[in-house]
Amino acid sequence: MGEENEQRIGERVYEFLRREGKDEQKMRVTIPEVLNCQYGMYVWPCAVVLAQYLWYHRKNLADKRVLEVGAGVSLPGILAAKCGAKVILSDSAEMPQCLENCRRSCKMNNIVGVPVIGLTWGEVSPDLLDLPPIDIILGSDVFYEPKDFEDILLTVRFLMERMPQAEFWTTYQVRSADWSVEALLCKWNLKCTNVPLKTFDADNECLAGSELPGRHTVQMMIITLDRKGAGHTG
C-alpha cells in the first residue's frame, strides 16, 4: 500500500472505435501508469499503434495464443485478451515492478487467467521452455536499445522453431537512421514485412482517444521465419 502511494499510480483510458456501415464497435482499456523514471511503467507511442493494429484485426484474434514480450503496462496484450485471444504477458525477469504492473493492468480490466511471466531476452529460461506453442508474439518498442536487438530476435527465433507459422507483430519508433535489424534478420533466418499505418487507420497523431503517438515516427512490421533464407522483404 505504502509502496503504491510512493509510486504515484495513475490511470489512463484508451477507447478504440470502429465504424462499419451503421454499426459502431467500441472497446475501452484502462491502463495503470506508474509515474516514475522506469520506462516500462507507462504507455509509449508504439504501444498505441500496435494496439490499433490488434483492434483493426480483432476478428482474427479469437482463441489465438498470444505472447506479449517486454509488455510493460501491457496495452496491446490487454486489448488482445479482451478480443478473445489466449494471452500470456511477459517482461524481464529482472524487472519485477513491470511484472507487477502487468498484473495490475489485468486486474484493472477485470481480466482473469492471464499468466504473467519473467522472460529475459536472449536467455533460454525454464519459463521460456515451458511456454505453449504461440501463434502471435507482440512487442511494442522493444527495439529501443541496439544492444538488445539480437537478444530479442534470438528469443523470437526460439519460439518460432516450435511454431513455424508464428508471427512477430512489432512496432518501433524511429530514433536513428543508423539503427537497423536487417543484418540480424538475415543471421537468424527471419524476414520482415513493413505494414503502412494507413492500412489499419493508425496514420494520425491521436489514436484511441489519446494524444499518442503524437508526432513520433512509428513503424509497424511483421517478422516471420524466412524459409528461403532471403532475409528482409517489404
UniProtKB/Swiss-Prot annotation:
<keyword id="KW-0949">S-adenosyl-L-methionine</keyword>
<keyword id="KW-0539">Nucleus</keyword>
<keyword id="KW-0963">Cytoplasm</keyword>
<dbReference type="GO" id="GO:0035242">
    <property type="term" value="F:protein-arginine omega-N asymmetric methyltransferase activity"/>
</dbReference>
<dbReference type="GO" id="GO:0040029">
    <property type="term" value="P:epigenetic regulation of gene expression"/>
</dbReference>
<keyword id="KW-0808">Transferase</keyword>
<dbReference type="GO" id="GO:0005737">
    <property type="term" value="C:cytoplasm"/>
</dbReference>
<comment type="similarity">
    <text>Belongs to the methyltransferase superfamily. METTL23 family.</text>
</comment>
<comment type="function">
    <text>Histone methyltransferase that dimethylates histone H3 at 'Arg-17', forming asymmetric dimethylarginine (H3R17me2a), leading to activate transcription via chromatin remodeling.</text>
</comment>
<dbReference type="GO" id="GO:0032259">
    <property type="term" value="P:methylation"/>
</dbReference>
<dbReference type="GO" id="GO:0005634">
    <property type="term" value="C:nucleus"/>
</dbReference>
<dbReference type="InterPro" id="IPR029063">
    <property type="entry name" value="SAM-dependent_MTases_sf"/>
</dbReference>
<keyword id="KW-0489">Methyltransferase</keyword>
<protein>
    <recommendedName>
        <fullName>Histone-arginine methyltransferase METTL23</fullName>
        <ecNumber>2.1.1.319</ecNumber>
    </recommendedName>
</protein>
<dbReference type="Pfam" id="PF10294">
    <property type="entry name" value="Methyltransf_16"/>
</dbReference>
<keyword id="KW-0156">Chromatin regulator</keyword>
<dbReference type="GO" id="GO:0035642">
    <property type="term" value="F:histone H3R17 methyltransferase activity"/>
</dbReference>
<dbReference type="InterPro" id="IPR019410">
    <property type="entry name" value="Methyltransf_16"/>
</dbReference>
